[in-house]
């Protein structure tokens, strides 16, 4: 591929970008004798560099805490027609040090127009480091 073809391809991809809105809701469960904190990052997994879509940080001394976060993603990686969304969860619930775990990946086809996607509901159990 020569340089002019690459530049035209990049311009076309830029023109075809449009806003996709995502909403993430759920419950975080942590049975702890002390206040606990969590940071939830939603990323769009790409081959080279993952994109940040949404994030929330909070602390609680309750056993359950709900979350509701929204984010926007304009496009996906080159030659990829799906959003690959994943939560990365940082917390101090099950240990005295920070623990990190990742949820499974949601594959969402790239729409042909701006879209508000249905909410993605995810329950997070910080004591067992898993999601449902």
Swiss-Prot record:
Pfam families xref list: DUF870
InterPro entries: DUF870_CAE_spp
Protein name in the entry: Uncharacterized protein B0416.7
